[in-house]
From Swiss-Prot:
Stored NCBIfam families: dephospho-CoA kinase (TIGR00152)
Protein name (Swiss-Prot/TrEMBL): Dephospho-CoA kinase domain-containing protein
Ranges of residues in domain DPCK: 3-207
Keyword annotations: ATP-binding, Nucleotide-binding
Gene Ontology terms, MF aspect: ATP binding; dephospho-CoA kinase activity
Alphabetical list of HAMAP family matching this protein: Dephospho_CoA_kinase
First and last residue of the signal peptide: none
Pfam families (alphabetical): CoaE
Tagged with keyword ATP-binding: yes
Xref: Gene3D superfamilies: P-loop containing nucleotide triphosphate hydrolases
Designated gene of the protein: dcakd
């Protein structure tokens, strides 16, 4: 099995690509979903965030106010680093757990959907391939304004908080251009999926795992024989 890092930019259409991959039966680990789970009410990350930022980031229900927290993240780099230092270790642990589960299920490759894959840098070394969902800057801006009901200035600020898509292009092994319609995007995803499925890059890990498993079985059998002698 090998890992494929999937990334994009805000409103570049990564969710569309993920939905197509899931339709194809691909294993996708969603870092954003995990990030929401690790800060649920009562979790260690939740307690640390409240301790650092105070009750002002909470809803009446006691849960984190994601809009307020998002405004902090996008407007203050130092506070963004604080939140990342709280949540990222727990996110990585859960991603590892899910990756191992897909390995035991026999998947040839697993997609790690990580919005800030190239910004964080630390995760790219684990990826056999990286995939970027791209769209032109004007399309990205218009999509974000429409999707989140933001002004042009607000949308521009949120886009500026991430590495520009054009800067990510040379960092990616594969690019899905999502500037057009869904059918065009789907064709690109199908082609890439076929290439990844036909790759033999998964074999070394499988062979190593099989060798280790065989060795453990032989060792266990030897111990059992001694016990019964």
């Amino acid at each position: 099995m090998f890992l494929v890092g999937l990334t994009g930019g805000i409103a570049s259409g990564k969710s569309t690509v993920v939905s197509i991959l899931r339709e194809l039966g691909c294993a996708v680990i969603d870092a954003d979903l995990i990030a929401r789970q690790v800060v649920r009410l009562g979790t260690p990350a939740y307690s640390q965030i409240v301790q650092h930022f105070g009750d002002g980031v909470l809803l009446v229900s006691g849960e984190l106010d994601r809009e307020k927290l998002g405004a902090i993240i996008f407007s203050d780099p130092e506070k963004r680093c604080v939140i990342n230092s709280i949540t990222h270790p727990q996110i990585r642990r859960e991603m590892l757990r899910q990756t191992l589960w897909y390995f035991f299920l026999g998947y040839r490759y697993v997609i790690l959907d990580i919005p800030l894959l190239f910004e964080s840098r630390s995760m790219t070394r684990y990826m056999k391939h990286t995939m970027l969902v791209y769209c032109d800057p004007q399309t990205q801006l218009e999509r974000l304004m429409r999707r989140n009901s933001l002004s042009r200035d607000e949308a521009t600020k949120r886009i500026a908080a991430q590495l520009p898509l054009d800067s990510k292009l040379p960092l990616a092994d594969h690019v899905i251009d999502n500037s057009g319609d869904r059918d065009n995007t789907r064709r690109q995803v199908l082609q890439l999926h076929a290439r990844l499925e036909s790759s033999l890059a998964y074999l070394p890990v499988r062979i190593t795992a099989a060798t280790v498993a065989t060795g453990l079985v032989v060792l266990a059998c030897g111990l059992l024989r001694r016990l019964w002698q």
